[in-house]
Regions:
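Residue-level signature of mid-helix packing/kink "hotspots" within the transmembrane helices
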Residues: 16, 44-52, 102, 135-136
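Hydrophobic core of transmembrane alpha-helices in multi-pass small-molecule transporters
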Residues: 9, 77, 88-102
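Conserved MFS/SLC helix-loop-helix module at the cytosolic interface between two early adjacent transmembrane helices
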Residues: 48-87
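Cytoplasmic helix-loop-helix junction between adjacent transmembrane helices
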Residues: 93-131
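Flexible cytoplasmic inter-helical loops of multi-pass small-molecule transporters
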Residues: 174-183
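Helix-loop-helix hairpin linking two adjacent transmembrane segments in secondary transporters
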Residues: 127-175
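Pair of pore-lining "gating" transmembrane helices in MFS-fold secondary transporters
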Residues: 1-24
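MFS 12-TM fold signature
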Residues: 43, 71-78, 165-169
Length: 183
C-alpha cells in the first residue's frame, strides 16, 4: 500500500509542478488568455477521454503495466513541453499529459483490488490523501524551482522536474509494485 501511496503522491506532485507557471509560459509562447484557458483544459479533456480506456485495459492486462505506461507517457509529455517550439506543441503536450493521467483511476482500482470491506475505505482514503498532498506540494516546488520572477522564470527546469518526478514514480512502480490482479 505504501508504494501506491508514493507513486500517486509523486505523480500528482509532477503534475502540480508546472501549474503555477503554465499560464505565463503559454503567454510567452503567444497565447491569449482564452487559449491559455483552453490549453489548461486540454489536460482534462485528455484525461476524460483516456481514463475509462486505461481502466478497461488494466482490467485485462493488469494494473502495473498500465500504471507504468501512463507514468512513462506523463514523463514524456513534460519533456515535450520543455522543448515545445510553439504553442501548438504546448497544446499537444497538455493533451498527451491528460491522456496519460490514467494513473489516478488505476491507483484507486489497485487499492480496491488489494483491500476488502474491512480496510477498503482506509485504503481509498490514503490514495485520496496522496492525491491531495501531491497536488499541494507540486505547485510549491514548481514555484521554488522557477525562481522569484515570472519574467525570468526557469520553465525548462520546472518541466524537467515534472518529467523526472514522473520517471521516478515509474521506476518505483517497476521495482516495488506487485501486480494487484494476482493478489
Amino acid at each position: 500500500m505504501a508504494i501506491i501511496f508514493l507513486v500517486t503522491f509523486i505523480g500528482l506532485m509532477g503534475f502540480g509542478i508546472i501549474l503555477p507557471l503554465f499560464p505565463f509560459y503559454a503567454e510567452r509562447m503567444g497565447a491569449s488568455p482564452e487559449i491559455i484557458t483552453l490549453t489548461m483544459a486540454a489536460f482534462s479533456l485528455g484525461q476524460f477521454v483516456a481514463a475509462p480506456l486505461w481502466g478497461r485495459l488494466s482490467d485485462s492486462i493488469g494494473r502495473k503495466p498500465v500504471l507504468i505506461l501512463t507514468l512513462l507517457g506523463s514523463s514524456l509529455s513534460y519533456v515535450i513541453l520543455a522543448y515545445a517550439p510553439n504553442l501548438t506543441v504546448v497544446i499537444l503536450s497538455r493533451i498527451l499529459s491528460g491522456l496519460m493521467a490514467g494513473n489516478i483511476s488505476i491507483a484507486f482500482a489497485y487499492v480496491t483490488d488489494i483491500t476488502d470491506d474491512s480496510n477498503r475505505a482506509a485504503g481509498l482514503g490514503k490514495v485520496s490523501a496522496a492525491l491531495g498532498l501531491g497536488f499541494m506540494t507540486g505547485p510549491a516546488i514548481g514555484g521554488l524551482l522557477a525562481g522569484n520572477s515570472v519574467e525570468n522564470a526557469n520553465y525548462l527546469l520546472t518541466a524537467w522536474a515534472a518529467a523526472g518526478i514522473n520517471f521516478v514514480a515509474m521506476v518505483a512502480a517497476i521495482v516495488f509494485l506487485k501486480e494487484s490482479l494476482d493478489a
